[in-house]
Regions:
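A detector of single, family-specific signature residues
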Residues: 1-363
């Protein structure tokens, strides 16, 4: 088998190929023009067919999609996608490709057997459906942020002239308030800016409506999302965002594995005679999943008296901030149970978790 490592850039791929003995056979750059890159992979497939094919390793970046698709097209046996490593003192593309190639070759047996590799932060490749759902929910989050930014700019114009108190309704997101904004008397430039902001606001609303319709449609085809939506305060967007970021639940052997995957478990830096003290959460994994779980805490605390009692107990000892993160972590473990056993949400969490939580708070 051959072991291919790729340092990917926009205009070229830096290639390093090793054989089964670890010897470097090829060390070169390949243009990303379609004819050049296809010629290279055609030749690689021909050379590797008689010796068991080839494996590939590359670092994750924002434009891996086409290369991963091409690797699959040309029969790559295993694609290892990893997080970028710490920058070396002497950094070149050839050195980076060589380091990736050595990492792949040294750990080739464990990777073939799907065993964990120490210090190898591997990125799980989602299915096509999950990748599309992740992209869809990310677009929805981005459009929501743009709409919020537009509303903040409108508020700034009103504050500039101390006009916010004249609004006919408490908030701006009503038909009556929008009609008032369209007829508001302002200076020429402020009026021009406000008109453009109102047009943007209308555009974001139309785009959000289209996105929400698509999310609701795809939710019906996603098994995990249909389970997650039974939680308090979970919308179609939140359930699809969380469900698509779980993927195959079998890759998480324990409930805590999902919490760790979403960066909700504490770091630990003990050395020598130092006391065993945990630090803040790692914040690795999906920031969008953590944001959604943080929003769900408020709804769960209103709806679930068992979780609320447990939260209040932690809050008295450690403060509200740590207590909220603890609830987020508990929600991640509850989601694991729900998806794995196909259970809908019930007060206190899943049956096993409900009994543990009730015993802890004395309910």
């Amino acid at each position: 088998m051959l072991y291919l490592s790729i340092d990917q850039h926009r205009k070229q791929l830096t290639i390093n190929i090793r054989n089964e003995q670890g010897d470097v056979l090829v060390r070169r750059q390949v243009s990303t023009q379609w004819d050049k890159v296809r010629e290279f992979f055609t030749d690689l497939r021909r050379q590797s067919q008689e010796i068991g094919g080839f494996m590939a390793i590359l670092e994750v970046c924002g434009f891996n999609d086409w290369l991963i698709t091409m690797l699959r097209e040309f029969g790559c046996q295993e694609i290892v996608l990893v997080h970028p490593t710490k920058r070396a003192t002497k950094k070149t593309d050839y050195r980076d490709a060589s380091a990736l190639g050595e990492l792949l070759w040294v750990n080739r047996q464990r990777i073939r057997e799907t065993k964990p590799v120490q210090n190898l932060k591997r990125v799980n490749l989602p299915s096509k459906t999950d990748a599309e759902n992740r992209q869809l929910t990310a677009v929805r989050q981005r459009v929501t942020s743009l709409r919020t930014r537009t509303l903040n700019k409108i508020q700034k114009i009103l504050l500039k002239h101390n006009l916010q108190q004249d609004c006919p309704t408490k908030g701006l997101q009503t038909k009556k308030a929008r009609a008032w904004l369209r007829e508001l008397s302002l200076d020429v430039i402020d009026r021009l800016e406000l008109d453009q902001l109102l047009e943007q606001w209308e555009l974001w609303n139309k785009q959000l409506q289209t996105l929400d319709e698509k999310i609701t449609e795809r939710l019906q085809e996603h098994e995990a999302a249909q389970v997650v939506i039974s939680m308090p305060g979970v919308s179609a967007y939140s359930s699809l965002a969380l469900g698509s970021r779980i993927g195959d639940i079998k890759r998480f052997p324990r409930p805590g594995s999902l919490a760790n995957y979403w960066g909700l478990t504490p770091r630990c830096r003990n050395s020598g005679q130092s006391t065993d003290r945990l630090g803040s959460i790692s914040k690795e994994g999906s920031a969008q999943a953590r944001f959604i779980l943080g929003q769900l805490v408020l709804h769960v605390l209103k709806f679930d008296e068992v979780i609320r009692s447990w939260y209040q107990r932690i809050k008295k000892r450690r403060g509200s901030r740590i207590a909220r993160v603890a609830v987020m972590r508990r929600l991640a473990t509850i989601i694991w149970h729900m998806v794995k056993h196909k259970e809908t949400y019930i007060v206190g969490g899943t049956p096993r978790h409900r009994s543990q939580t009730a015993a802890a708070v004395g309910v």
